[in-house]
A protein has these predicted regions:
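Short alpha-helical scaffold segments that flank and stabilize functional sites
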Residues: 28-29, 105, 146, 150
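Hydrophobic (often cysteine-bearing) scaffold residues that line and stabilize catalytic clefts
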Residues: 14, 18, 90, 94, ...
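Catalytic Zn2+-binding segment of zinc metalloproteases
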Residues: 100-117
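Metalloprotease/metallohydrolase-associated module, dominated by Zn2+-dependent proteases
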Residues: 115-166
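A short small-residue
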Residues: 3, 76-83, 124-129
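Auxiliary, metal-adjacent structural segments of Zn-dependent hydrolase domains
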Residues: 2, 9-69
Length: 166
């Protein structure tokens, strides 16, 4: 898997953790298709906390090239308006990346597609008008469910590496 991270003012340890989470998530979610996939991760201002998309210049019939955008400024504040401390921010950053990697998996496995401009989940059109409908959409139910598992399993591996057990 080819990965590139575009980010400014991010320390080396966090950058390594992001590369690690990209690889860990791909290994868990789409191990047989990893070698053909390329992912560009951008940390920059964005209208959403995070978004995964098929790269525009490539076909969406058999997607292999992806772009993930995460807004590190937006995720620095929790749902109650509290500013996160550094370790909470890093944890949220990794969890958001895990969530977006689930969407990448959905694109790769053709579970999440776009037909005639409409988003489809397993060939059924899905759309939402409200925040409640967004959280009930099948692709989001899966992504929110798997993000925590990916984060916990990756953190356990990272802690073993840091302590010298691996």
């Amino acid at each position: 898997m080819k990965t590139i991270i575009h980010a400014k003012n991010i320390d080396k340890k966090v950058r390594l953790a992001l590369y690690g989470m990209l690889h860990h998530s791909a290994t868990k979610l789409f191990p047989r298709r990893m070698k053909n996939v390329s992912i560009k991760l951008h940390l920059k201002h964005h209208i959403y906390d995070g978004e995964a998309m098929i790269e525009e210049e490539y076909s969406d019939r058999n997607p292999k090239h992806f772009k993930i955008i995460i807004d590190p400024y937006r995720i620095a504040i929790d749902d109650w308006g509290r500013e996160l401390n550094y370790s909470e921010w890093v944890s949220t950053l990794l969890r958001t990346l895990a969530h977006e990697m689930v969407h990448v998996k959905q694109y790769i496995m053709r579970e999440l597609t776009f037909k005639k401009g409409a988003m489809c989940w397993n060939n059924m059109k899905v759309g939402w008008m409200s925040e409640e409908e967004y959280y009930c959409a099948p692709q989001e139910v899966e992504a929110y469910g798997l993000e925590k598992w990916l984060q916990l399993s990756y953190t356990a591996s990272w802690n073993k590496i840091e302590s010298g057990e691996i």
